[in-house]
C-alpha cells in the first residue's frame, strides 16, 4: 500500500497540489510567485501543527486574525493579528500551535524573481532567522494596501511582470523601514550573550547535519567551549548539545516525511555511523522509531 504522502511546502509542490489548484479565487500562482489571500477560505490544511517543513523559497506572511506559535530555524515566535513574518529561503519551519479561525495571507516569490533581496533590502537577521514585525494601525493599513494592490495587479491581463516585481520590492523596503524604526525606538537591545546565541543558532542550522561537536561551534565563534556552553545555557535554558540534537531531529523529521529516502539513506545524509545508531538516537529524542514516525498521518 502506498504510504500517506505528506504535504510539502516547496513552491513546485504547492503549485501542483490539487487543493491549491482548485481554489483559484483565493490564490494566484505562476512561474514567478505564489500568493494566497485566505487560507481559511481555501478550506484545506496546508500546514499541520507539530510537523516540521523545509521551505525552499522565502515567504512574506501577514497574520490577519488569531494567534499561533511558529519556529523558524529553531527560533520560536508568537505570531498574532497585525504581525508580519518574513521567512528566509531554505528555512526549517514548525508550527507548534494555532488558535481556532487562524487566518493569514502569504506572498511567496521564487528564488530568481527577486535576486536583489539578499544583498540590498533585508538585514542579516532576515537571512539567518527571519523577522517578526508587530505593526501599529498606520503601518498595518499601508501593508494592507500593498497586498491589495499586488493582488489586483496579478489579475490584470496581460501579466505585468515588472510592476509585480517592483511592487514586492517596494513592500520589502517598507517592511525594512518598519523593522529598522522599531529597532531604533525600542530601548531593549540584544545583549552580547543574546547576539552570541543567535549566531550560534545560525551556525547550528547551517552545520548540524555534519558537525555535532561543541568545539566546532566554539571555534567558529572564536570562543572557548566552556564559555560557549555557559552562554548558551544561561541565555536559552538549554545546552549546546540539546540545540544541536533538536536541529538534527527536525531535519530527520523533514526527510522522513518529505523525501523518498530510506532510513539508511537518511542516516547517511545526517552523518550517522550506521542506521542502527540513527534509529536509537531518533527514538531517544522522540519516543518512536523512524518507521513509526513515517507512518503517522
Locate each region found by the language model:
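A hydrophobic/aromatic-rich effector-binding and dimerization subdomain
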Residues: 2-7, 20-29, 96-152, 181
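Short hydrophobic/aromatic patch on the recognition helix
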Residues: 82, 228, 277-278, 282
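Short beta-strand His + acidic residue motifs that chelate non-heme Fe in jelly-roll/DSBH
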Residues: 69-71, 87, 93-98
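Terminal helix-turn-helix DNA-binding modules in bacterial transcription factors
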Residues: 234-276, 295-297
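Short acidic-glycine-tyrosine-enriched beta hairpin
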Residues: 74-88
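Short, Lys/Arg-enriched, Trp-marked, Pro/Gly-tolerant hinge/linker segments that flank
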Residues: 134, 157-162, 175-202, 206-221, ...
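…primarily DNA-binding HTH/wHTH and HhH modules…
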Residues: 280-297
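Generic protein-terminus/edge-of-domain signal
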Residues: 1-67, 77
Amino acid at each position: 500500500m502506498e504510504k500517506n504522502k505528506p504535504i510539502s511546502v516547496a513552491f513546485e509542490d504547492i503549485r501542483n497540489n490539487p487543493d491549491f489548484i482548485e481554489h483559484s479565487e483565493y490564490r494566484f500562482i505562476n512561474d514567478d510567485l505564489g500568493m494566497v489571500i485566505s487560507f481559511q477560505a481555501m478550506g484545506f490544511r496546508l500546514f499541520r501543527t507539530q510537523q516540521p517543513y523545509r521551505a525552499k523559497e522565502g515567504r512574506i506572511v501577514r497574520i490577519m486574525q488569531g494567534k499561533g506559535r511558529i519556529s523558524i530555524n529553531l527560533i520560536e515566535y508568537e505570531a498574532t493579528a497585525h504581525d508580519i513574518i518574513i521567512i528566509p529561503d531554505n528555512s526549517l519551519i514548525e508550527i507548534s500551535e494555532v488558535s481556532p479561525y487562524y487566518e493569514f495571507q502569504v506572498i511567496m516569490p521564487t528564488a530568481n524573481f527577486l535576486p536583489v533581496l539578499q544583498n540590498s533590502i533585508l538585514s542579516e537577521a532576515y537571512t539567518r532567522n527571519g523577522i517578526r514585525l508587530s505593526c501599529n494601525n498606520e503601518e498595518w493599513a499601508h501593508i494592507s494596501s500593498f497586498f491589495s494592490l499586488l493582488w489586483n495587479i496579478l489579475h490584470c491581463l496581460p501579466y505585468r511582470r515588472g510592476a509585480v516585481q517592483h511592487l514586492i520590492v517596494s513592500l520589502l523596503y517598507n517592511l525594512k523601514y518598519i523593522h529598522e524604526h522599531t529597532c531604533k525606538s525600542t530601548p531593549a537591545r540584544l545583549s552580547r550573550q543574546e547576539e552570541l546565541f543567535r549566531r550560534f543558532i545560525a551556525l547550528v542550522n547551517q552545520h548540524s547535519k555534519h558537525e555535532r561537536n561543541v568545539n566546532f561551534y566554539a571555534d567558529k565563534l572564536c570562543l572557548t567551549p566552556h564559555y560557549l556552553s555557559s552562554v548558551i545555557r544561561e541565555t536559552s535554558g538549554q545546552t549546546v548539545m540539546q540545540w544541536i540534537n533538536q536541529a538534527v531531529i527536525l531535519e530527520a523529521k523533514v526527510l522522513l516525511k518529505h523525501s523518498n529516502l530510506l532510513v539508511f539513506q537518511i542516516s547517511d545524509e545526517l552523518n550517522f555511523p550506521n542506521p542502527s545508531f540513527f534509529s536509537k538516537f531518533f527514538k531517544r529524542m522522540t519516543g518512536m522509531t523512524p518507521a513509526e514516525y513515517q507512518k503517522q498521518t
